[in-house]
């Protein structure tokens, strides 16, 4: 059954514009923010960084000010609050000290603390890399989606350092399901939760793509990988009773199938180096 949704376009930095709408809500899903962000240090610039921080921090403050005292805020944070970890680490839990250096992740840490200290009821989710088919282009550079796109066109994936980097992933539909689950469950009591399903490597994702489309070409380089990264533990989330219903291979197969009919450069070659 389709729900009727009232849409209001307003500026999150304008408290007067948003307050009258937010104050009536029992649950606030705070997804507003700048999504065109740098993935690595060399891609960032001061102007962009300042805008990311302003929208994230001032916007969240306005949302919290607008909420009524009995409302709950559901907030999507990010796995990259650990991007500054110096050594590889598996199954990082919610008690691990955050370590950031980019504006996006640093702002998320500030947001987490704003929410925790606000006195409001909350559930904060540190999302893994969110994959899965959608009609927008926002997540096209997320590694599983990008690899699926390349595979759908019989392209070439070049794996930097053999693709040994660790990745924590989560299906898009399950993220939405989890946010809905918060509204229905009484087990989320002012906590931070890692919202991830699969812990894998870049190479393993590429191999799934090749399993689905054997025409895909994979090239591995011998470059040294200074830090393989980290993975997140989802034990705390699973203890609430939430269950995932999607998986990586099924979602990749769906993306490859749906994108395989588009015209595309068959000679495309892509090298994966990023951290998303």
Could you say what each language-model-derived stretch is?
Residues 13, 81-82, 130-132, 175, ...:
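Conserved sequence/active-site signature of Rossmann-fold short-chain dehydrogenase/reductase
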Residues 155, 160-276:
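C-terminal substrate-binding subdomain of Rossmann-fold SDR/epimerase-dehydratase oxidoreductases
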Residues 113-167, 172-176, 209:
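NAD(P)-dependent short-chain dehydrogenase/reductase
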Residues 30, 58-103:
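Conserved Rossmann-fold NAD(P)-dependent oxidoreductase catalytic core, especially the SDR/UDP-sugar
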Residues 89, 96, 100-107, 136, ...:
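The catalytic Tyr-centered alpha-helix of NAD(P)H-dependent dehydrogenases
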Residues 9-55:
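NAD(P)H-binding glycine-rich loop region in Rossmannoid oxidoreductase-like domains
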Residues 13, 47-62, 98, 102, ...:
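Glycine-rich NAD(P)-binding loop of the Rossmann-fold in SDR/ketoreductase-type enzymes
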């Amino acid at each position: 059954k389709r729900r009727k949704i009232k849409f209001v376009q307003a500026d999150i930095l304008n408290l007067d514009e948003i307050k009258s709408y937010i104050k009536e809500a029992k649950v606030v899903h705070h997804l507003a923010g700048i999504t065109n962000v740098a993935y690595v240090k060399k891609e960032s610039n001061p102007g962009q960084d300042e805008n990311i921080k302003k929208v994230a921090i001032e916007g969240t403050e306005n949302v919290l000010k607008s909420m009524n005292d009995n409302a709950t805020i559901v907030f999507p944070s990010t796995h990259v609050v650990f991007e500054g970890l110096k050594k590889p680490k598996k199954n990082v839990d919610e008690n691990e000290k955050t370590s950031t250096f980019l504006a996006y992740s640093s702002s998320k840490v500030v947001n987490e603390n704003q929410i925790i200290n606000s006195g409001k009821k909350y559930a904060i989710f540190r999302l893994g890399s969110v994959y899965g088919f959608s009609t927008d282009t926002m997540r096209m550079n997320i590694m599983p989606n990008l690899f699926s796109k390349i595979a759908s066109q019989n392209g070439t994936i070049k794996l930097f350092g053999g693709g040994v980097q660790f990745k924590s992933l989560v299906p898009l539909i399950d993220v939405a399901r989890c946010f809905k689950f918060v509204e229905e469950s009484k087990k989320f009591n002012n906590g931070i939760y890692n919202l991830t399903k699969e812990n894998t490597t870049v190479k393993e994702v590429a191999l799934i793509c090749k399993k689905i489309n054997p025409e895909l070409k994979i090239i591995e380089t011998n470059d040294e990988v200074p830090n393989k990264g980290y993975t997140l533990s989802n034990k705390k989330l699973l203890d609430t009773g939430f269950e995932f219903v999607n998986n990586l291979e099924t979602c990749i197969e769906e993306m490859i199938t749906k994108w395989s009919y588009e015209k595309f450069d068959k000679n495309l070659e892509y090298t994966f180096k990023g951290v998303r």
